Amino acid sequence: MSFTDETVRFEFGDSDKKEIGETLVDVYNVLEAKGYNPINQIVGYVLSGDPAYIPRHDDARNKIRRFDRDDIVEELIKNYLKDNGVNL
């Protein structure tokens, strides 16, 4: 695999953004209901890609796996920046 020094533009649609947010809320609620620390589990999944961090309960694992982890990270960063006064 070769890499380039050129900056690559990465974009995805608005409907995906809403679905990612809704999915994260659903997964958070499932993790909390099962007695896990939701933040730690979601971070573990996003960093490693290992779906074992997310339970199968209420289809949470399949829901979160529909999205690329890069897209999840992008949505999390955008929301954090918006919540902290950055005009995107």
UniProtKB/Swiss-Prot annotation:
Q: Which InterPro entries match?
A: IreB
Coiled-coil segments: none
A Pfam family (short name) is: IreB
Q: Which domain of life is it from?
A: Bacteria
Family from the record: Belongs to the UPF0297 family.
Q: Which PANTHER family match?
A: UPF0297 PROTEIN YRZL
Question: This protein is called what?
Answer: UPF0297 protein YbeA
This protein's species is Lactococcus lactis subsp. lactis (strain IL1403)
